[in-house]
Design a protein with these regions (language model features):
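Aromatic- and acidic-residue-enriched segments that line the glycan-binding/catalytic groove
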Residues: 199-211
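Bacterial N-terminal signal peptides that target proteins for export
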Residues: 1-9
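Intrinsic-disorder/low-complexity accessory segments
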Residues: 23-184, 224, 230-231, 236-238, ...
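Intrinsic, low-complexity polybasic segments
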Residues: 12, 714-723, 728-730
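Secretory-pathway/luminal and periplasmic proteins that interact with or process carbohydrate-rich
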Residues: 193-198
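Short acidic/histidine-rich active-site segments
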Residues: 259-262
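Bacterial N-terminal signal peptides
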Residues: 8-19
Length: 812
């Protein structure tokens, strides 16, 4: 009996610990089994929302979140709340600054300290910098940025933001008081306000139906969906621009806590350190910082009874697309908590746990995973408990090690401004060229200093007025180097010889993607006095050209590439008009009466054809375009339309239209051919109208991409197929002569320019862009993404020529 009582007490204590933010009285809050004293008159989230964030099946709207923070700031002298701008569709983009009242009264002073430590050149001559920095470090505060809700189906983080803010604003616990004294917390409740309502509206609509907990049948960011967290070096989106310009570049945080969710059948929580590789331009102090902090958080959480925690797995630190802070003096602490079904609880049995692609098996304790989570129910409250506990451990470490964080931050800046070693690249020159202004704009948004010396000569080469010089001995020279040099991703294999899948992609050479020539300079620079920067122009009014009847296929299974395609067409100076066409629209047929061009963005052939399975979504969103859609597209092309297929969508066209083209890498193992997001060289047939005005060589963004070869003797095959088809309009035979190769990979050298490519011999001389004539129309097959994430300006003309008969957009 005594044993049973002790066991029950242990279970009760464990449950009490996990219910860390349940309110127990007007002036207390529970944390780890103890009630913290609270300041009076501070509204709790449930006072405004009507429920506690983390309750099953309860989501807050964005207006409710903003309202809560407004009320919190009015009631607490520890909170300053401000609107930094507007989101893509016009919602307020907000931030709460939380600290001790005396710190909030001196924010300008602390911002100045950060500015000086970030750029030690501003501290005077080298001999006196360390002494001045030591005094600033003694007075300064650790700056912690907490970002939530960038991925809107990961609802735990934006809900947790209110729990975190309330505790900081109301608790009189000495540990919280220490955090407030030693840190300044910049809390962004959501980096994607638009998605909060998109997800809530869909969740509420399906609540109580068989489709409760499904993802919305649209992107949760108007243009990028999940890719909004891949924009931290190109800065294409409004939300990225606001975060960088008004938070990162103003406050220079030492720590960025980026709160996410992951799948439901792996670990309960990921924390750094990250798995290899680390991008070469990430400073060693950053690696040491995220390793120390991530291991501390994991160790403390395990000690408190949290289970299923992994480190050094799954996620890497390779790309600046996800980690702006790593190139700007701050560590990024990514946390990934296991998901439920939006806000609906799930049950995960132990035997349903799945081994991660990299680093750990959730059914076995190891150096990178443990202790075991034995399965069971998983609620939104579990998610918010993991998130808030991790966040307060991070804040505790920042508070207790304030001077160490500031010293590390200063050391990064001090090293960055030190002159480069002789013989190494110490600068880049960017001559005036098409798209150079866009490249320079991205660098400038990233804090990179750019000089315009006028006409000058380096290494016997004369550079004209307007050429830009970027010295690498500057605070963010590493960021510039990462975007202007090519990447050589390491050849990582498992024990079987299979390549290890990178977390995202392997190349981020923005100069190559934009087609901008860059000259590395090794010699010491002696330049004329910098002149005023030349005007860079701006996006003009929205214009179009004849033949602008364009459709973009919008699957009910949302495609990020579809969103990027719309962004490219809508948000530049050219503004090419277009109409979205859904599965239900497409099945109706009669496309040619409304459109001349039909674009199918990158998506798998199976998803395009079949979409969601019946029973997994409401019936109107299932089934893909189906054979009715295929028939409509066939008729559209035969009647004179142009079907443009991007990347994997080309496989759909090859299969459904029985085109005389095959994908030569379709059934090749990853051991023999592998290109996980890299920049390759292509050769263009500039006599073809689609490649007119282009250089003979260009780049291609290749990721899960087909590689084409024309099928010999295809005329007879297609003639026989056409004879059997029972439709009013007979498809013409498609002899090989009706297939035009517009771009191919070079046959005499490795196509790889940046990233990682295995099995390059398999694609030498093969086609990357082809045009197939059918009836009165044509199908254009891109074996790459010509508008990749809004970055590959070098190949925009190929895409624009494919969808505009007589249009050459002004992309200077």
């Amino acid at each position: 009996m005594r044993t049973r009582i002790v066991g029950l007490l242990l279970i009760a204590a464990f449950l009490l610990q996990f219910n860390s933010f349940a309110r127990v009285g007007a002036n207390t809050v529970e944390t780890g089994g103890e009630a913290e004293p609270l300041a009076t008159g501070i509204p709790a989230p449930e006072d405004v929302l009507g429920f506690v964030p983390g309750d099953d099946r309860k989501l807050a709207s964005w207006s409710q979140v903003v309202n809560y923070f407004e009320q919190l700031a009015q009631a607490s002298d520890r909170v300053k709340f401000e609107t930094l701008g507007n989101s893509t569709i016009g919602k307020p983009f907000v931030m709460a600054t939380i600290s001790a009242p005396e710190n909030l009264a001196r924010l300008d002073d602390y911002r100045k300290i950060q500015e000086l430590l970030a750029d030690p050149r501003k501290l005077g001559l080298p001999g006196g910098r360390d002494r001045k920095a030591a005094e600033l470090i003694r007075r300064g505060k650790a700056i912690v940025l907490i970002t939530c809700g960038i991925h809107s189906t990961e609802v735990g983080s934006y809900l947790s933001s209110m729990l975190i803010a309330h505790r900081l604003a109301s608790s009189n616990d000495p540990a919280i008081q220490s955090v407030l004294q030693n840190t300044i917390i910049l809390l962004v409740p959501s980096l994607n306000p638009d998605g909060v309502d998109i997800v809530k509206d869909w969740y509420d609509k399906t609540l109580g139906t068989p489709y409760e907990g499904t993802d919305p049948p649209e992107l949760y960011h108007k243009y990028t969906g999940h890719d909004n967290n891949r924009d931290w070096y190109a800065f294409t989106q409004v939300e990225t621009q606001l975060t960088v310009a008004k938070i990162h570049n103003v406050w220079h945080p030492q720590i960025v806590h980026d709160i996410h969710q992951q799948g439901s059948t792996g670990s309960r929580l990921f924390l750094p350190p990250y798995m290899r590789p680390v991008e070469p331009n990430v400073p060693k102090q950053i690696v040491a910082g995220y390793t120390e902090l991530g291991n501390f958080m994991a160790r403390e959480m395990r000690g408190q009874g949290f289970k299923g925690i992994t480190t050094n797995s799954t996620y890497d630190a390779w790309s600046p697309s996800r980690a702006y802070s790593h190139y700007h003096g701050g560590v990024r602490i990514l946390s990934e908590t296991a998901s439920c079904k939006i806000a609906t609880p799930i049950t995960v049995k132990f035997d349903q746990l799945r081994k991660a692609e990299q680093g750990y098996d959730p059914k076995k304790e190891s150096a990178t995973f443990g202790p075991l989570w034995n399965g069971g129910e998983w609620h939104l409250r579990d998610i918010t408990n993991y998130m808030t506990t991790a966040a307060f451990l991070l804040l505790r470490h920042a508070s207790e090690n304030r001077e160490e964080w500031l010293n590390r931050f200063y050391a990064i800046g001090k090293e960055a401004v030190r002159p480069e070693n002789p013989g190494l690249v110490n600068a880049f020159v960017i001559p005036p060229a098409d798209n150079s202004a866009r490249l320079l704009d991205a660098l400038e948004r990233g804090g990179v200093e750019i000089e315009f010396p006028g006409t000058f000569i380096i290494n016997r080469r004369r550079y004209p007025q307007g050429a830009a010089v970027i010295r690498l001995a500057q605070p963010y020279g590493g960021f510039a180097r990462a975007l202007l040099k090519t990447q050589q991703y390491p050849d990582l294999r498992d024990s079987s010889g299979r390549p290890q899948q990178p977390y995202d992609v392997t190349a981020h050479t923005l100069s190559l993607l934009m087609g901008v020539p860059v000259a590395p300079i090794h010699a010491p620079l002696v330049l004329p006095k910098p002149r005023p920067e030349p005007g860079r122009g701006s996006n003009g009014g929205c214009g179009d050209a004849p033949g602008g009847r364009r459709a973009i296929y919008r699957s009910y299974s949302p495609s990020m590439d579809e969103g990027w395609t719309r962004w490219v067409l809508e948000n530049q100076s050219w503004c090419l008009y277009h109409t979205p066409v859904t599965d239900s629209d497409l099945r109706k047929g009669d496309l040619h009466s409304s459109f001349d061009y039909f674009i199918i963005p990158d998506q798998s052939a199976a998803t395009i054809l079949n979409g969601y399975k019946a029973g997994t979504m409401p019936p109107e969103y299932t089934g893909g375009m189906g054979q009715a859609g295929v028939k409509a597209l066939r008729e559209f092309v035969e009647q004179g339309g142009t079907l443009v297929c991007l990347n994997r969508a080309s496989t759909f066209a090859i299969e459904q239209f029985k085109l005389p083209v095959r994908d030569v890498v379709a059934n090749v193992s990853e051991k023999e051919f592998f290109v996980p997001g890299s920049i390759l060289r292509i050769e263009l047939d500039t006599s073809n109208p689609i490649a007119r005005g282009m250089p003979k060589e260009a780049i291609a963004w290749v990721e899960d991409s087909p590689v084409f070869e024309v099928i010999p003797g295809s005329a007879d095959i297609l003639s026989a197929m056409s004879a059997k088809r029972e439709t009013a309009d007979k498809m013409s035979a498609l002899p090989a002569a009706n297939v035009h190769i517009i771009a191919r990979y070079p046959s005499d050298r490795n196509p790889l320019l940046s990233g990682w490519l295995l099995g390059e011999s398999r694609i030498r001389g093969k086609a990357a862009l082809v045009e197939v004539m059918i009836g009165k129309g044509r199908i254009i097959l891109f074996g790459f993404r010509p508008q990749y994430r809004g970055q590959s300006l070098a190949t925009y003309p190929l895409f624009f020529h494919a969808i505009s008969a007589r249009y050459s957009p002004p992309i200077h």
